[in-house]
Amino acid sequence: MTGEVGWVYTLHLHTPLGTTGRNSARHYTGWACEHGLLARLKSHRSTYADAAMMRWCARAGIGWHLSALARGTRADERQAKKHGAARRCWTCQAAA
């Protein structure tokens, strides 16, 4: 359901995933249902995670932490992915 309100979250990776420059990722933005945020975050730690990027992080031993959280829909998540995650990442904002 696109209109269901849940949580739009951003994770900050402790080590960039990928190579360098535009081929690397430092953040992951996702959506979780109203009461499913903790379960969704826990699933990201698994080497069998639904999200491919988080699965690779788990397999590579890359740690991460929650770095932004807001109420929103899946449409809000897609919109957030179009704009740089570092803009809403608490960790990156503190380092700037």
What are these regions (language model features)?
Residues 53, 85-88:
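Secretory pathway export signals and precursors
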